[in-house]
Regions:
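N-terminal periplasmic "start-of-domain" segments of outer-membrane beta-barrel proteins
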Residues: 173-174
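Short acidic/polar, Gly/Pro-enriched loop/turn segments located at secondary-structure boundaries
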Residues: 1-133, 144-169
Protein backbone atom coordinates (compact mmCIF):
# COMPACT_ATOMS: atom_id res chain seq x y z
CA UNK A 1 0.00 0.00 0.00
CA UNK A 2 1.51 3.32 -1.05
CA UNK A 3 0.63 6.94 -0.38
CA UNK A 4 1.79 9.51 -2.92
CA UNK A 5 1.94 13.15 -1.86
CA UNK A 6 1.70 16.38 -3.91
CA UNK A 7 5.45 16.50 -4.44
CA UNK A 8 5.45 13.02 -6.00
CA UNK A 9 7.09 11.44 -2.96
CA UNK A 10 5.76 7.95 -2.25
CA UNK A 11 5.47 6.49 1.22
CA UNK A 12 5.06 2.73 1.64
CA UNK A 13 2.55 2.09 4.41
CA UNK A 14 4.05 -0.95 6.05
CA UNK A 15 2.28 -2.90 8.78
CA UNK A 16 5.64 -3.88 10.27
CA UNK A 17 6.75 -0.33 11.05
CA UNK A 18 5.25 2.77 12.58
CA UNK A 19 4.16 5.17 9.88
CA UNK A 20 3.73 8.01 12.36
CA UNK A 21 7.34 9.13 11.82
CA UNK A 22 7.05 9.35 8.03
CA UNK A 23 3.61 10.94 7.66
CA UNK A 24 2.64 14.52 8.49
CA UNK A 25 1.83 14.87 12.19
CA UNK A 26 -1.84 15.67 11.61
CA UNK A 27 -2.44 12.30 9.92
CA UNK A 28 -2.97 9.49 12.39
CA UNK A 29 -1.68 6.25 10.91
CA UNK A 30 -2.74 2.98 12.45
CA UNK A 31 -0.71 0.34 10.64
CA UNK A 32 -2.15 -2.61 12.50
CA UNK A 33 -5.64 -1.50 11.46
CA UNK A 34 -4.57 -0.49 7.93
CA UNK A 35 -6.04 2.98 8.36
CA UNK A 36 -5.24 6.67 7.86
CA UNK A 37 -7.22 9.34 9.70
CA UNK A 38 -7.21 12.95 8.46
CA UNK A 39 -9.77 14.35 10.94
CA UNK A 40 -7.06 16.27 12.80
CA UNK A 41 -5.90 18.09 9.65
CA UNK A 42 -6.62 21.78 10.15
CA UNK A 43 -5.43 23.77 7.17
CA UNK A 44 -6.49 26.31 4.60
CA UNK A 45 -3.93 24.78 2.23
CA UNK A 46 -4.74 21.39 0.80
CA UNK A 47 -2.58 18.70 -0.74
CA UNK A 48 -3.67 15.92 -3.04
CA UNK A 49 -2.90 12.41 -1.84
CA UNK A 50 -3.11 9.20 -3.87
CA UNK A 51 -3.56 5.87 -2.10
CA UNK A 52 -2.75 2.76 -4.14
CA UNK A 53 -4.07 -0.52 -2.78
CA UNK A 54 -2.45 -3.59 -4.38
CA UNK A 55 -3.96 -6.98 -5.09
CA UNK A 56 -4.87 -8.91 -1.95
CA UNK A 57 -4.99 -5.84 0.31
CA UNK A 58 -7.63 -3.43 1.61
CA UNK A 59 -7.41 -0.16 3.51
CA UNK A 60 -9.55 2.39 5.34
CA UNK A 61 -9.16 6.15 5.18
CA UNK A 62 -11.07 8.69 7.28
CA UNK A 63 -11.17 11.99 5.41
CA UNK A 64 -10.88 15.38 7.10
CA UNK A 65 -14.69 15.80 7.20
CA UNK A 66 -15.19 12.43 8.93
CA UNK A 67 -16.20 10.53 5.76
CA UNK A 68 -15.06 6.90 6.03
CA UNK A 69 -13.83 5.08 2.92
CA UNK A 70 -13.01 1.36 2.76
CA UNK A 71 -10.80 0.68 -0.26
CA UNK A 72 -10.68 -2.76 -1.87
CA UNK A 73 -7.79 -4.41 -3.70
CA UNK A 74 -6.48 -3.04 -7.00
CA UNK A 75 -7.78 0.44 -6.21
CA UNK A 76 -6.41 3.97 -6.64
CA UNK A 77 -8.03 6.70 -4.55
CA UNK A 78 -7.25 10.41 -5.05
CA UNK A 79 -8.38 12.88 -2.38
CA UNK A 80 -7.44 16.21 -0.78
CA UNK A 81 -6.03 16.43 2.74
CA UNK A 82 -8.59 19.18 3.44
CA UNK A 83 -11.81 20.08 1.64
CA UNK A 84 -11.89 23.74 0.62
CA UNK A 85 -14.78 25.34 -1.24
CA UNK A 86 -18.37 24.35 -1.90
CA UNK A 87 -17.81 20.70 -2.88
CA UNK A 88 -15.97 17.69 -1.49
CA UNK A 89 -14.47 15.92 -4.53
CA UNK A 90 -12.52 12.64 -4.67
CA UNK A 91 -11.58 10.27 -7.52
CA UNK A 92 -11.68 6.49 -7.61
CA UNK A 93 -10.40 3.76 -9.88
CA UNK A 94 -11.32 0.38 -8.42
CA UNK A 95 -13.81 -0.35 -5.65
CA UNK A 96 -14.68 1.41 -2.40
CA UNK A 97 -17.45 1.59 0.18
CA UNK A 98 -18.27 5.13 1.35
CA UNK A 99 -19.92 6.29 4.57
CA UNK A 100 -20.22 10.00 3.82
CA UNK A 101 -20.37 12.59 6.60
CA UNK A 102 -23.46 14.76 6.26
CA UNK A 103 -22.92 18.33 5.06
CA UNK A 104 -26.00 19.74 3.32
CA UNK A 105 -24.08 22.80 2.11
CA UNK A 106 -21.20 20.89 0.49
CA UNK A 107 -22.06 17.83 -1.61
CA UNK A 108 -19.62 14.93 -1.68
CA UNK A 109 -18.70 13.91 -5.24
CA UNK A 110 -16.93 10.72 -6.32
CA UNK A 111 -15.56 10.74 -9.86
CA UNK A 112 -14.54 7.65 -11.81
CA UNK A 113 -13.54 7.44 -15.47
CA UNK A 114 -17.17 6.99 -16.49
CA UNK A 115 -19.45 8.01 -13.59
CA UNK A 116 -19.90 10.93 -11.24
CA UNK A 117 -21.78 10.25 -7.97
CA UNK A 118 -23.09 13.17 -5.91
CA UNK A 119 -24.24 12.75 -2.29
CA UNK A 120 -25.01 14.84 0.78
CA UNK A 121 -24.55 12.13 3.43
CA UNK A 122 -25.11 8.44 2.90
CA UNK A 123 -23.56 4.98 2.50
CA UNK A 124 -22.86 3.44 -0.89
CA UNK A 125 -20.43 1.24 -2.83
CA UNK A 126 -18.79 2.07 -6.17
CA UNK A 127 -17.10 -0.52 -8.38
CA UNK A 128 -15.30 0.94 -11.37
CA UNK A 129 -12.31 -1.19 -12.31
CA UNK A 130 -13.07 -0.80 -16.01
CA UNK A 131 -15.40 1.50 -17.94
CA UNK A 132 -17.42 -1.55 -19.04
CA UNK A 133 -18.10 -2.66 -15.46
CA UNK A 134 -19.15 0.36 -13.42
CA UNK A 135 -21.74 -0.04 -10.64
CA UNK A 136 -23.00 2.25 -7.88
CA UNK A 137 -24.98 0.49 -5.13
CA UNK A 138 -26.83 2.61 -2.56
CA UNK A 139 -27.06 1.30 1.00
CA UNK A 140 -28.62 4.27 2.87
CA UNK A 141 -29.75 7.77 1.96
CA UNK A 142 -29.86 9.14 -1.58
CA UNK A 143 -27.29 9.57 -4.31
CA UNK A 144 -27.40 10.88 -7.84
CA UNK A 145 -25.25 9.41 -10.62
CA UNK A 146 -24.41 10.68 -14.07
CA UNK A 147 -21.99 9.64 -16.76
CA UNK A 148 -18.89 11.79 -17.09
CA UNK A 149 -19.99 12.98 -20.53
CA UNK A 150 -22.46 15.41 -18.97
CA UNK A 151 -25.54 13.22 -18.87
CA UNK A 152 -28.49 13.97 -16.61
CA UNK A 153 -28.31 12.80 -13.01
CA UNK A 154 -30.28 9.67 -12.06
CA UNK A 155 -31.41 9.40 -8.42
CA UNK A 156 -30.92 6.11 -6.57
CA UNK A 157 -32.81 4.86 -3.53
CA UNK A 158 -31.60 2.34 -0.91
CA UNK A 159 -31.03 -1.12 -2.34
CA UNK A 160 -30.70 0.04 -5.95
CA UNK A 161 -27.73 -0.74 -8.21
CA UNK A 162 -27.00 1.61 -11.10
CA UNK A 163 -25.02 -0.17 -13.83
CA UNK A 164 -23.57 2.11 -16.50
CA UNK A 165 -24.24 0.88 -20.04
CA UNK A 166 -21.98 1.47 -23.08
CA UNK A 167 -24.48 4.03 -24.43
CA UNK A 168 -24.01 6.19 -21.30
CA UNK A 169 -27.36 5.32 -19.72
CA UNK A 170 -27.92 3.42 -16.48
CA UNK A 171 -29.85 0.23 -15.81
CA UNK A 172 -31.32 0.27 -12.28
CA UNK A 173 -31.85 -3.02 -10.45
CA UNK A 174 -32.61 -3.92 -6.86
Amino acid sequence: ITLQENNGEKVVLDQKQSNSQILPKAIAAQSEKKELDYRQVVSTITQTHVLTIPRGENFKVVLCDGTEVWLNANTNFVYPTAFIGNERIVSLEGEAYFKVAKDAKRPFIVKTRTVQTRVLGTEFNIRSYTPEDTHVVLINGKVEVSNTQGGAFTRLYPGEDAHLQPDGNFILTE
